[in-house]
């Protein structure tokens, strides 16, 4: 992950999407806190067959992904997970938009499901 907020966003999304998959708890995660630290992560990443990168959708994120690809080439499965949140700056922005969409849907359902209030008055 490029930043800690993206990691926390991932945990939130994972909990919502697949709360009953305990094998996900056995995975390791690296938070760079800046893509400028990607070189420091190259050695520890060498211990893994599969690497999933959750970098920002910007030039720096693409460059970090390129560096990891150059280091490991075809010997590792490398996934660019930023495709999941294409159109957003990062995973945290994607999560925020998902939450806002849910709020809008819930408020729209709430408005439609409420029947109009009856006025108190004289009835024959």
Positions of predicted regions on the chain:
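Helix N-cap/beta->alpha junction signal
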Residues: 2-5, 57
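Short amphipathic alpha-helical face segments that pack within enzyme cores
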Residues: 5-12
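TOPRIM fold recognition
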Residues: 12-124
